[in-house]
Curated annotation (Swiss-Prot):
The keyword Cytoplasm does not apply. Belongs to the DNA mismatch repair MutS family. PANTHER family: DNA MISMATCH REPAIR PROTEIN MSH1, MITOCHONDRIAL (PTHR11361:SF34), DNA MISMATCH REPAIR PROTEIN MUTS FAMILY MEMBER (PTHR11361). GO terms for molecular function: ATP binding; ATP-dependent DNA damage sensor activity; damaged DNA binding; mismatched DNA binding. The keyword DNA damage applies. This protein is involved in the repair of mismatches in DNA. It is possible that it carries out the mismatch recognition step. This protein has a weak ATPase activity. GO terms for cellular component: cytosol. It comes from the Bacteria. CDD domains: ABC_MutS1. One of its GO terms (biological process) is mismatch repair. ATP binds at residues 643-650. This is DNA mismatch repair protein MutS. Gene3D superfamilies: 1.10.1420.10, 6.10.140.430, DNA repair protein MutS, domain I, MutS, connector domain, P-loop containing nucleotide triphosphate hydrolases.
Length: 884
């Protein structure tokens, strides 16, 4: 914003794009109010308040010399969030000015902290020349940082995509548009409103935009920052115009999204928002991608959580599937691996292409990975070039990375992999741009442009001449010093420089009477005098001028270079994509060799057959790991899994789902063999957790997740259910578990692994021929239990709950009391069932009533001899005698 003084007032000019984002009517009112009060403030505060009015919901970092200052409410908020000092200095409009500031050179660390906290920041720089300014130096907002529009390397996680998402509502659908500003990837999709929570979990946006007249419960549950925009910013006609202008097309038919009206509205609002924050035309955003739900296996929020894809149930990053597989050697590969794990492919042709590439790379990854390791983050460096926010070391890093690609092309042998052949072609480097980078940028440039030392020698004649003046400075000063010593006869005369007084001749106080007449005193100290001569002054002006002009010339050349590199952006994006895919595929090959994984086989026939499958993460933590097989088909749809706690039921179910997921990502799997038919979704209901924030009990969460499965699972879905019904009374829980299993068998007809401790439920295989029983084996050893962890056909004989309780450290007296109570309950149950003519196959087969325990024995079992005093021991003896 520029402030102009006119008849004592202030005219505030506001760019059209700002008006478009904030609402013309509302903004006009705000500016009118501001216009009427600005004259009561100091000139500098008038300028600040005018800028702040444009960004009322952002922290404004206002550049003043070597600091970014924040004022008033911004200062208080920044002080609280950043732990910086809040002060009061001077006054404006009769009130003290509240201030807080951060050093300019250390600003990035504070910006990074604010970004993590979800705050938006407007960076206001000095753009005018202080020497030519009559009032406050002209300032403009040059950069806006919001959580979803970060591109600076210091503000981003190398292993995660940073996504900005916009949501628009249409007739019965929601339009989603998301953009990764650091890569230029722009993706549209449409979903039914009921799938929004699932999509937010999958996309995991850093920031969400949505119209002010839209509400959905899922928005309350997501933790990222959210920004409401005026509904008119999602106008369909305006959005179409914004998008066609960006892509220089007549319409959107070529992108396959012309019929996706809600998604187009979201995309238009999103693109306008990004243009506003970045203050550029976004040249690296060159296309739209339409994402169809059928492209990927659907994983709901519960499934992503329960499978611990990249976060444990405790919220930690390790041990997870991602942490196990992530031996990638590039930042781009690390991000792509995470994305692939969250987006398993559904189309078998695409999966087979990846698997074939992995197979080919098993013989090549040793030669490829050292070259890949030398490739920097081309994707994000190229994005910063596009946005013209690149720093000198972005360009040197880009240059060094691009120089690795020809060698990578030569070493890669695609053989019979069409995917690898395509990636090899994508590694073609735009040579003209690379030559420009090689010629223009020093081998090791300065970190920031203002320090100089960025543009290579020989690139620009004018810059070379200015540098020559500076480099010859030392030689001139030596000659001048020798000349003046000889001319003055003062042998200890020195010529020196400091940043305050510039160049000077230093002479001791005792010899100051002998100086030549043309010496002019510059500074007097205790023991020395400092002088300047016309010749030295002329040289000083020349050197200092050369330094300033050299820095200005370097900035001009650097900015010009960024402009000249724009045509290479599309090619660099292809390079980045190829490197990322090669890195992940080579990682899959390396992991397959090291971890002894095999290639899965895909079939058009329904079913799932895994021989000696292993849990990829657990097998690395527990050795030896017992492998187990699983077989599901249209004739064996539901496996009812029984067995003791800690026997491995949950591990068995999770490993089945993870093997299916890995296979659909194009990765080899931990098994002896795996044949997988068509799968469209994976559902899980495992573990117990409540939702206190949402006001839902553990049982309510369980039932909600189960309802989602029953409503959405198909005959091509894989369903994992663990302990359904345990959060309520025994009969309620058993009834619910039976009804859920029946629904899955009769209606959904999904492939289901159903773990339970309700032994009565095992009879369901007698009623439904497509259900079968398996169990995790265990054997008793003395008073304890040994878990065998192997899966056997048929139901378990007992749960071994008391033995597990003993292993957990439950006091022996409690365990013994439980055993006695168990006998009573089992006797009662057998009697009731016998009277009804319905004996339980488990109870009837296993109940062997123990004789009643003598009171003396019970008392002795409760005694801890080591803790008794002599007096207490005597009392116990008297008590025992009475019990006989």
């Amino acid at each position: 914003m520029h402030g102009e003084h006119d008849r004592g007032g202030v005219i505030i000019k506001v760019c059209d794009d700002v008006l478009a984002l904030a609402g013309k009517h509302e903004r006009a009112i705000n500016l009118t109010k501001l216009d009427n009060t600005l004259e009561q403030h100091t000139p500098m505060m008038r300028q600040y308040l005018g800028i702040k009015a444009q960004y009322p919901d952002m922290l404004v970092f206002y550049r003043m010399g070597d600091f970014y200052e924040l004022f008033h409410d911004d200062a208080e908020k920044a002080s609280r969030l950043l732990g910086i000092t809040l002060t009061k200095r001077g006054s404006s409009n009769g009130e003290p000015i509240r201030m807080a500031g951060v050093p300019y050179h250390a600003a990035e660390q504070y910006l990074a902290k604010l970004a993590k906290l979800g705050e938006a920041v407007a960076i206001c720089e000095q753009v005018g020349d202080p020497a030519k300014s009559k009032g406050p130096v002209e300032r403009q907002v040059t950069r806006i940082l919001t959580p979803g529009t970060l591109t600076d390397a210091a503000l981003l996680d190398d292993t995660r995509d940073n996504l900005l998402l916009a949501i628009a509502h249409g007739e019965g659908v929601l339009g989603l548009a998301r953009i990764n500003l650091a890569s230029g990837r722009f993706i549209l999709s449409e979903i039914t409103p009921g799938l929004l929570a699932q999509e937010l979990e999958r996309i995991s946006p850093a920031e969400i935009l949505y119209p002010d007249d839209f509400y959905h419960m899922a928005l309350e549950q997501v933790k990222c920052p959210k920004k409401r925009l005026a509904p008119w910013q999602f106008d369909l006609d305006s959005s179409i115009q914004t998008l066609t202008k960006q892509f220089s097309t007549y319409d959107l038919d070529g992108f396959g999204c012309a019929h996706m009206l809600a998604a187009i509205m979201a995309a238009g609002a999103l693109l306008d928002y990004v243009k506003h924050t970045q203050r550029t035309s976004l040249p690296h955003i060159q296309s739209l991608m339409v994402e169809q739900g059928s492209q990927f296996i659907q994983l709901d929020a519960a499934t992503r959580r329960n499978l611990e894809i990249d976060q444990t149930l405790r919220g930690e990053s390790s041990p997870t599937l991602y942490s196990l597989l992530n031996t990638t050697v590039t930042a781009m590969g690390a991000r792509l691996l995470r994305s692939w794990l969250h987006h398993p492919l559904q189309h078998q042709a695409d999966i087979q292409a990846r698997l074939q590439a992995v197979k080919v790379l098993q013989a090549q990854y040793d030669g490829l990975r050292p070259l890949l390791r030398n490739v920097g983050d081309i994707e994000r460096m190229a994005a910063r070039v596009a946005l013209k926010t690149a720093r000198p070391r972005d360009l040197s890093g880009l240059r060094d990375s691009l120089q690795q690609l020809p060698a990578l092309q030569r070493v890669l042998r695609p053989e019979d992999s069409a995917l690898l052949h395509s990636l090899q072609q994508q590694l073609d480097v735009p040579q003209a741009a690379l030559d420009m980078l090689i010629a223009a940028i020093k081998d090791e440039p300065a970190a920031v442009l203002r320090e100089g030392g960025v543009i290579a020698d020989g690139f620009d004649a004018e810059l070379d001449e200015l540098r020559a003046i500076q480099s010859n400075c030392g030689e001139f000063l030596l000659q001048f010093e020798a000349q003046e010593r000889e001319r003055s006869g003062i042998s200890n005369l020195k010529v020196e420089y400091n940043s305050v007084h510039g160049f000077y001749i230093e002479i001791s106080r005792a010899q100051s009477e002998n100086v030549p007449a043309e010496y002019r005193r510059r500074q007097t100290l205790k023991n020395v005098e400092r002088y300047i001569t016309p010749e030295l002054k002329t040289f000083e002006d020349k050197v200092l001028s050369a330094n300033e002009r050299a820095l200005a010339r370097e900035k001009f050349l650097f900015d010009e270079l960024l402009g000249n590199l724009q045509p290479a952006l599309a090619a660099w994006q292809r390079n980045a994509e190829a490197v990322a895919q090669l890195d992940v595929l080579a990682t899959f090959a390396e992991r397959a060799d090291v971890l002894k994984y095999v290639a899965p086989q895909f079939s058009s026939e329904a079913g799932l057959d895994i021989v000696d499958g292993r849990h990829p993460v657990v097998e690395q933590l527990a050795q030896p790991f017992i492998a187990n097989s699983v077989s599901l088909s249209p004739y064996r749809q539901l496996l009812l899994i029984t067995g003791p706690n800690m026997g491995g039921k949950s591990t068995y179910m999770r490993q089945t789902a993870l093997i299916v997921l890995l296979a659909h990502c194009g990765c080899f799997v931990p098994a002896k063999s795996a044949r997988i038919g068509p799968i469209d979704r994976i559902f899980t209901r495992i573990g117990a957790s409540d939702d206190l924030a949402g006001g839902r009990s553990t049982f309510m969460v369980e039932m909600t997740e189960t309802a989602n499965i029953l409503h959405n699972a198909t005959e091509r879905s894989l369903v994992l259910l663990d302990e359904i019904g345990r959060g309520t009374s025994t009969f309620d829980g058993l009834s619910l578990a039976w009804a859920v299993a029946r629904q899955l068998l009769e209606k959904n007809r999904s492939y289901t692994l159903f773990a339970t401790h309700y032994f009565e439920l095992t009879r369901i295989s007698e009623e439904f021929k497509h259900a079968a029983n398996v169990h995790l084996d265990a054997v008793e050893h003395g008073d304890g239990i040994v878990f065998l962890h192997n899966v056997e056909e048929g139901p378990a004989s007992q749960s071994y709950g008391l033995q597990v309780a003993q292993l957990a450290g439950i006091p022996r007296t409690v365990v013994n009391a439980a055993k006695r109570k168990l006998v009573q309950l089992e006797q009662s149950q057998v009697m009731q069932q016998s009277l009804a003519g319905q004996g339980d196959m488990f109870v009837a087969a296993n109940v062997e009533p123990e004789p009643a325990t003598h009171p003396v024995v019970s008392e002795l079992e409760s005694i801890d001899p080591d803790s008794l005093t002599p007096r207490q021991a005597l009392d116990v003896l008297y008590k025992l005698k009475k019990l006989i």
